From Swiss-Prot:
Pathway: Secondary metabolite biosynthesis; terpenoid biosynthesis. Homodimer. It comes from Euphorbia lathyris (Caper spurge). This is Short chain aldehyde dehydrogenase 1. Its EC number is 1.1.1.1, 1.1.1.-. It comes from the Eukaryota. The active site is at S153, Y166, K170. It is an enzyme of class 1 (oxidoreductase). Keywords: NAD, Oxidoreductase. The gene is ADH1. One of its GO terms (molecular function) is oxidoreductase activity.
Length: 288
């Protein structure tokens, strides 16, 4: 009879596994690359940020465990190439983490949303996710096992006054995840999403118009804004927290978890911040 705690707390949770991480050169992706390698995985970083990608490989320090491949996730040939490169170099593909994404503009008004911007966000966030899953499934189905992950957003769990292109693209990604889970489960392949609250990343800095600002100023400014809106206080969500969620879903600890949208938002999506704030004000007035 197996014990209920069979996992060695010091073990490498992805030992022997091979992963592709799109958008892996910076932000959540880069943090996940480092964590996956730490836990024994061999990782192919897929990104369009060539300098950052090569720099990350150099930082990790061994081509035996990490490789960079230029990949525009909206290009079928690029995505096919990165999957084929992983199989050619490391012999297989166990994990596809479709993490690449763009935010588009911050303006939440539909009349201010440019058609080309809307299409571009869908091209990267949705079509890019579709291509990642399609080419991962191509090599996973014959092996009758595998794990496909998407980075979604808590904005797809609720309606928020956010940019339509970004929010709707994440809703679409969640739908893709569910459909793939139903189809690919028949081949032993698990499919899940990780949906974070706001995290300070280069993508978010760009969305806030702070791409070239001092990193410490960016961090303090955006974290302050996020903290004021957050439901869970006294703790800050970081890229490492999303990487840890991805690690769990990619590991054998989650071997029977599929079709899940793991929302990492401190309970934000199950609350009504505006109503809560109104009640708090009313309570304060009543007890003056």
């Amino acid at each position: 009879m197996n014990g209920c705690c069979s996992q060695d707390p010091t073990s490498k949770r992805l030992e022997g596994k091979v992963a592709v991480i799109t958008g892996g050169a910076s932000g959540i992706g880069a943090c996940t690359v480092k964590l996956f390698v730490k836990h024994g995985a061999k990782v192919v970083i897929a990104d369009v940020q060539d300098e950052l990608g090569h720099s990350l490989c150099k930082e990790i320090g061994s081509e035996d465990v990490v490789t960079y491949v230029h990949c525009d996730v909206s290009s079928d040939s690029d995505v096919k190439n990165v999957v084929d490169s992983a199989v050619s170099k490391y012999g297989k593909l166990d994990i596809m983490f479709s993490n690449a994404g763009v935010s588009g503009g911050l303006d939440p008004r539909i009349l201010a949303t440019e058609n080309d911007e809307f299409k571009k966000v869908f091209e990267v966030n949705v079509f890019g996710g579709f291509l990642a899953a399609k080419h991962a499934a191509r090599v996973m189905i014959p092996e009758k096992k595998g794990c496909i992950l998407f980075t979604s957003s808590n904005s797809a769990a609720i309606a928020i006054p956010g940019p339509h292109s970004y929010v709707v693209s994440k809703h679409a990604l969640n739908g893709l995840m569910k459909n793939l889970s139903a189809e690919l489960g028949q081949h032993g392949i698990r499919v899940n999403c990780v949906s974070p609250f706001g995290v300070v990343t280069p993508m978010m800095a760009t969305a806030f118009g702070m791409k070239d600002a001092d990193p410490e100023v960016v961090k303090a400014t955006i974290e302050g804004l996020l903290a004021s809106a957050a439901n869970l206080k006294e703790v800050t969500l970081g890229a490492e927290d999303i990487a840890n969620a991805a690690l769990y879903l990619a590991s054998d600890e989650a071997k029977y978890v599929s079709g899940l949208n793991l929302v990492v938002d401190g309970g934000y999506s199950v609350t009504n911040p505006s109503f809560t704030a109104t009640l708090q004000k009313a309570f304060a007035v009543a007890h003056v």
